[in-house]
Design a protein with these regions (language model features):
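Peptidoglycan cell-wall recognition and remodeling modules
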Residues: 12-113
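N-terminal prepro-regions of secreted/extracellular proteins
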Residues: 1-11
Length: 113
């Protein structure tokens, strides 16, 4: 006979608007991939959701360009969690299974990802 399902317990959690973008990334990634993503976001914006590149349309935590947001089917958001989701979507499409560590390796060589 099949085993009964293990009950799932949920912790009460704050709305995403009240959660740190860095914490969301940490929850979504393996520890190794998070370390790479953290280094990358520190270099790109120091995790500043209001960061703007003076020489391009890149802005936010991931410093994504406007065309990149459009290619992802997204719009730039002032909200850091949305910016992290967009950066992770971009990294997933561009670097595949190498993920944030692939993006970080590329950044170290070229100073962009």
């Amino acid at each position: 006979a099949p085993q009964p399902a293990v009950p799932v317990s949920f912790k009460p959690r704050p709305p995403l608007s009240q959660v740190s973008p860095k914490l969301i990334a940490k929850e979504l990634l393996t520890p190794k991939q998070f370390r790479c993503f953290d280094k990358l976001m520190q270099k790109e914006s120091n995790w500043n959701s209001k960061a703007k590149n003076p020489s391009s349309t890149a802005r936010g935590i991931g410093q994504l360009l406007e065309p990149t947001y459009r290619n992802l089917g997204m719009r730039h958001s002032k909200h850091g969690v949305t910016q992290v989701v967009a950066a992770l979507a971009y990294i997933g499409r561009k670097y595949g299974s190498s993920g944030p560590c692939g993006a970080w390796k590329h950044w170290q060589k070229h100073k962009w990802y």
